[in-house]
């Protein structure tokens, strides 16, 4: 899981370059997931950050990739009731922090600590990971027009979402989690949906309902 989130955040930072243009690969690795995320953030210039807790699931981090790209922010990792020292070091010049998840994921104590540092805080969290991903999409839409969304299964499709996270970040495109059968939104005209995963992950009915292009191996 530490390797997975490190890879995901690396992709979010790097975007999606042409594979033929890659002449070398830089290894970024910390002693744990918190330091790895901080080392990646060191490669960026930013005034905003996105904070997620990946102790139990990667879902919030994957949903946040489009928002991170939209506001030009690194994804940093938090514990529920405290900010790890490696994460705290990366907050020095931050003006705004987006907390992903309810207080069950990242508690009020973390929010208060950020505010004490003079950082504006916006929390985006729903009743579950599906609603949270939809609320993140709404936040992106309030900042910029959306012309594409990725939909995947929020419980069995994390690997599929990970494969699209770099593109979602590059394009500021939401990754919306579903139960594989329904979506928490009405598809708008001019928005292209991409369904991530096979029929076992995303049903054919959902693909038809959203007029989505299925991306599956």
Q: Which sequence ranges carry the predicted segments?
A:
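Extracellular glycan-binding segments that recognize GlcNAc-based cell-wall polysaccharides
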Residues: 2-13, 17-217
């Amino acid at each position: 899981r530490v390797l997975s989130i490190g890879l995901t955040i690396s992709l979010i930072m790097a975007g999606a370059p042409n594979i033929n243009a890659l002449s070398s690969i830089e290894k970024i690795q910390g002693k744990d997931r918190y330091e790895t995320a901080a080392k990646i953030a060191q490669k960026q210039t930013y005034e905003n950050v996105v904070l997620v807790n990946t102790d139990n699931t990667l879902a919030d981090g994957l949903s946040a990739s489009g928002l991170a790209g939209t506001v030009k922010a690194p994804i940093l990792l938090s514990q529920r009731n405290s900010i790890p020292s490696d994460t705290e070091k990366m907050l020095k010049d931050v003006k705004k922090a987006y907390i992903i998840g309810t207080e069950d994921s990242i508690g009020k104590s973390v929010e208060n600590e950020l505010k004490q540092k003079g950082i504006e805080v916006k929390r985006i969290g729903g009743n579950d990971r599906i609603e949270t991903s939809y609320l993140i999409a709404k936040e992106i839409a309030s900042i910029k027009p959306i012309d594409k969304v990725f939909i995947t299964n929020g419980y069995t499709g994390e690997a599929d979402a990970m494969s699209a996270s770099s593109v979602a970040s590059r394009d500021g495109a939401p990754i919306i989690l579903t139960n594989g059968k329904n979506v928490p939104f009405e598809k708008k005209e001019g928005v292209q949906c991409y369904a991530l995963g096979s029929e076992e992950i995303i049903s054919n009915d959902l693909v038809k309902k959203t007029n989505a292009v299925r991306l599956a191996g």
